[in-house]
Amino acid sequence: MTLLLNKGSSLVNESKYNQAIDIFSKAINLDPLWAEAWNKRATVFYLSGNFEKSQKDIDKVLELEKRHFGALAGQGLVNIQLKNYDKAINSYKRAKEIYPSMKSPDIMIKQIKELIKEQTI
């Protein structure tokens, strides 16, 4: 399984997203309870602009592992793209609760609040 994740990650680094999705899907089919395979595929869906599929996979990650702070941070990114700013802020707050020393939630929450201000002007 680790070999599949490594292969998929290499494909992502080469921007071969469709092939990476296939590899991560294979890992999911082999072990549908392995949260990290779902999270990797969610990341590739995000990178390829398929935010709805990314969110669906993130939901599965959090169903399997509710404290997966990486998935919560990814959920924040997805919700920014979907302009669901309040949901994005909540995702980052949850990530920060789980991993208090994580720096990105504070940075992203500040940026989201700026986006909200810009839209109300």
What are the residue ranges of the model-derived segments?
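Canonical tetratricopeptide repeat
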Residues: N6, K40, L47, G74, ...
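Structural signature of tandem alpha-helical TPR/SEL1-like repeats
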Residues: N13-I23, L47-K60, L82-R94, I116-I121
